[in-house]
Swiss-Prot record:
Expressed by the venom gland. Disulfide bonds join 30-51, 36-56, 40-58. GO terms for cellular component: extracellular region. The record marks 59 as: Aromatic residue of the functional dyad. It comes from Isometrus maculatus (Lesser brown scorpion). PROSITE patterns: SCORP_SHORT_TOXIN. This is Potassium channel toxin ImKTx88. It is found in: Secreted.
Amino acid sequence: MSNFSVFLIALLFCSVFILSEAQIYTSKECNGSSECYSHCEGITGKRSGKCINKKCYCYR
Protein backbone atom coordinates (compact mmCIF):
# COMPACT_ATOMS: atom_id res chain seq x y z
CA MET A 1 0.00 0.00 0.00
CA SER A 2 2.82 2.44 0.76
CA ASN A 3 4.42 1.88 -2.67
CA PHE A 4 1.16 2.77 -4.34
CA SER A 5 0.78 5.99 -2.34
CA VAL A 6 4.35 7.05 -3.19
CA PHE A 7 3.67 6.33 -6.86
CA LEU A 8 0.42 8.30 -6.73
CA ILE A 9 2.07 11.34 -5.13
CA ALA A 10 4.92 11.24 -7.69
CA LEU A 11 2.40 11.03 -10.54
CA LEU A 12 0.45 13.99 -9.17
CA PHE A 13 3.62 16.06 -8.75
CA CYS A 14 4.81 15.34 -12.29
CA SER A 15 1.39 16.11 -13.77
CA VAL A 16 1.20 19.49 -12.05
CA PHE A 17 4.71 20.37 -13.21
CA ILE A 18 3.99 19.42 -16.83
CA LEU A 19 0.70 21.33 -16.90
CA SER A 20 2.27 24.48 -15.50
CA GLU A 21 4.92 24.39 -18.25
CA ALA A 22 2.22 24.25 -20.93
CA GLN A 23 0.56 27.52 -19.85
CA ILE A 24 1.88 30.87 -21.12
CA TYR A 25 0.83 34.09 -19.38
CA THR A 26 0.37 37.19 -21.53
CA SER A 27 -0.33 40.75 -20.46
CA LYS A 28 -3.11 41.22 -23.04
CA GLU A 29 -6.38 42.23 -21.41
CA CYS A 30 -9.58 40.47 -22.43
CA ASN A 31 -13.27 40.18 -21.62
CA GLY A 32 -13.82 36.73 -23.11
CA SER A 33 -11.82 33.77 -24.34
CA SER A 34 -12.66 34.52 -27.98
CA GLU A 35 -10.53 37.67 -27.75
CA CYS A 36 -7.46 35.57 -26.91
CA TYR A 37 -7.59 33.17 -29.87
CA SER A 38 -5.84 35.34 -32.47
CA HIS A 39 -3.33 36.64 -29.91
CA CYS A 40 -2.41 33.10 -28.82
CA GLU A 41 -2.17 31.92 -32.41
CA GLY A 42 0.61 34.46 -32.93
CA ILE A 43 2.48 33.25 -29.85
CA THR A 44 2.08 29.47 -29.93
CA GLY A 45 0.78 28.78 -33.44
CA LYS A 46 -2.44 27.36 -31.97
CA ARG A 47 -5.78 29.00 -31.25
CA SER A 48 -5.85 27.63 -27.72
CA GLY A 49 -6.31 30.41 -25.23
CA LYS A 50 -8.44 31.31 -22.25
CA CYS A 51 -9.40 34.56 -20.54
CA ILE A 52 -8.72 34.27 -16.80
CA ASN A 53 -9.10 37.30 -14.51
CA LYS A 54 -9.22 39.58 -17.58
CA LYS A 55 -5.82 38.36 -18.86
CA CYS A 56 -5.11 35.99 -21.74
CA TYR A 57 -3.45 32.65 -21.03
CA CYS A 58 -2.19 30.61 -23.98
CA TYR A 59 -1.65 26.85 -24.03
CA ARG A 60 0.95 24.95 -26.07
